[in-house]
Amino acid sequence: MGKRFFFILILAFPLISWGQTKTNWETLAGVQYSYIQNYEQNFWYGKPTFSDKVKALENQEIIIQGFIIPGDISGNSYYLSAFPFSSCFFCGGAGQESIMELRLKNPKKKLKLDQVVTLKGTLRLNDHELELNYILEEAVVQKD
């Protein structure tokens, strides 16, 4: 009985992580930009063209690690960055592909500036100017 259970457990182990793709920022860097002017609001923005590798991640559950950047004072909005605050897209000149908007499954969870976290969620690609290129929906902080 014990050997059979152990054998079944070994066979089932790969299924536990099935459906999730561990992703890194290097993969998400697979994007090119065409700069377009928004005449109504008078600003330029980078319209992304995603690589096939990035497109394959759309609407997939991914796992990614990065640095937390709070989006507002109330602590209800967060971003995940490939770099700490001093080097992030908004502050230090990194590219648009190095940050993603987080839509937390539990928005009451408080996260700190530059906290290193691993998150799991569904990746949505966005090519509209008013949101970031990458949005992680139903994001959950993983236990390290």
Protein language model regions, located:
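Sec-dependent N-terminal signal peptides
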Residues: 4-14
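OB-fold and OB-like single-stranded nucleic-acid-recognition modules
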Residues: 19-144
